[in-house]
Regions:
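Structured loop/turn residues at beta-strand edges in well-structured enzyme cores
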Residues: 95-98, 168, 186-188, 256-258, ...
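Short mixed-charge
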Residues: 152-175, 179-181, 320-340
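Binuclear metal-ion centers of metallo-dependent hydrolases, dominated by the metallo-beta-lactamase
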Residues: 244-369
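Residue-level signal for inorganic ion chemistry
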Residues: 15, 144, 294
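Active-site flanking residues adjacent to catalytic metal/cofactor-binding acidic residues
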Residues: 78, 106, 237-238, 265, ...
Length: 369
């Protein structure tokens, strides 16, 4: 079957996974350089073979391609983490990508924003474009200004920072909780959800600093992270440990009140984590959101792609299609998702996977069809 593509007359949406791994990425260096006698990591070691390609997982990131009201395709990148440039070098040519019309940043962690400097490759000497529009929360903008002042004010650039010069050229846009915005004048609508009372919790942080030798007694607050709903066709939730109840009415419905076609949802590993959903939490959220298709992302190295496929097949059918004996990891994963209704479509994403949403809401992709 040939790769699905966004047809000229289509009013649908493409989504390409640039990265599906947590901040550490895969493979892990400690796994590839393990000492004799140490337990081998099947997931990381498999990346050294062609068969293990889907276990190579860069920082979570994706590209949305959707037709604007003028008929032109608009390219939106979600998050530019520590290995964004490597992901772009691999996947942009393969998918015919070049100009970036907008960048959306979910939160101010390194795996979401440390690739901002690499965007100079697009604006350097105006070879591709004179600037890139970047959409962030006020809190994220403040952190970018603190961490990379030359990206916000070019007088901080050591080389001078001429327009179309040696530093990236950005136009910054501050976006707000539950306030839909348009990507320039394209007609493309994005709804961010974060902030109080609506918030995606991505771990926790403390309200004050503790002395190094003492435990903090300060109040613990959720660390808030943006999710995005784009054109009522895609919900993106890459870094989340909890979805509050008042978020669900936003993310459960697509066009005309139908289920949203595609949900991209965090799943670090089998067990729960302070900053990320574990498998049981992810599947429970997927069942509640009720998207036509849910793609899991943000994986560590504890579970291989093949094992996630087996587990999610069980979620959908109540049985697996695998003809081989189940691994211990698969058995544990299936045990964790027992008790809920079957019939939902969930699969692990992988770097380079392309998902196509037709204007009618039907969904196909390049791996599962």
């Amino acid at each position: 079957m040939s790769s699905p593509t966004l047809k000229q007359a289509d009013d649908g949406l493409d989504f390409i996974f640039l990265g599906t791994g947590t901040s550490s990425s895969l493979p892990h260096i400690e796994c590839l350089t393990a000492l004799p006698g140490e337990k081998p990591c099947r997931t990381c070691l498999s990346t050294l073979t062609p068969e293990g390609k889907k276990n190579t997982r860069r920082n979570t990131s994706g590209v949305v391609r959707v037709r604007g009201k003028d008929g032109n395709i608009v390219t939106i990148v979600i998050d530019v983490g520590k290995n964004f440039q490597a992901a772009a070098l691999e996947w942009f040519p393969k998918h015919g990508l070049r100009k970036i019309d907008a960048v959306l940043i979910t939160h101010a962690h390194a795996d979401a924003m440390n690739g901002l400097d690499d965007l100079r490759g697009w604006t350097l000497n105006c070879h591709i474009q004179p600037h890139i529009d970047v959409y962030v929360s006020e809190a994220t903008f403040t952190e970018i200004h603190r961490s990379f002042p030359y990206l916000v004010m070019k007088e901080f650039a050591s080389g001078g920072g001429d327009v179309c010069g040696d530093v990236p050229e950005f136009k910054w846009h501050i976006i707000h909780d539950k306030v839909p915005f348009e990507i320039q004048e394209t007609g493309i609508s994005v709804t961010p959800f974060s902030g109080k009372p609506l918030a995606l919790h991505h771990g926790r942080h403390f309200s004050s600093k503790a002395e190094p030798s003492k435990a903090s007694s300060s109040k613990i607050h959720p660390y808030l992270c943006f999710g995005f709903k784009i054109q009522d066709a895609l919900v993106y939730l890459s870094d989340v440990s909890h979805i509050p109840e008042d978020v669900y009415p936003i993310i459960q419905k697509g066009k005309g009140g139908a289920p949203v076609p595609v949900c991209v949802l965090d799943c670090l590993r089998l067990q729960a984590h302070t900053s990320h959903m574990g498998l049981a939490e992810s599947i429970a959220a997927a069942r509640k959101i009720g998207a036509s298709r849910t793609y899991l992302t943000g994986f560590g190295h504890e579970v291989s792609h093949e094992e996630y496929v087996t587990i999610t097949e069980y979620v959908g059918m109540g049985e697996t299609a695998s003809k081989r004996p189940l691994s211990d990891v698969e058995k544990e994963g299936i045990q964790l998702v027992q008790g809920g209704p079957h019939g939902i479509w969930v699969r692990p994403a992988h770097d380079g996977l392309k998902v196509v949403v037709a204007g009618t809401g039907s969904v196909v992709d390049t791996s599962y069809f």
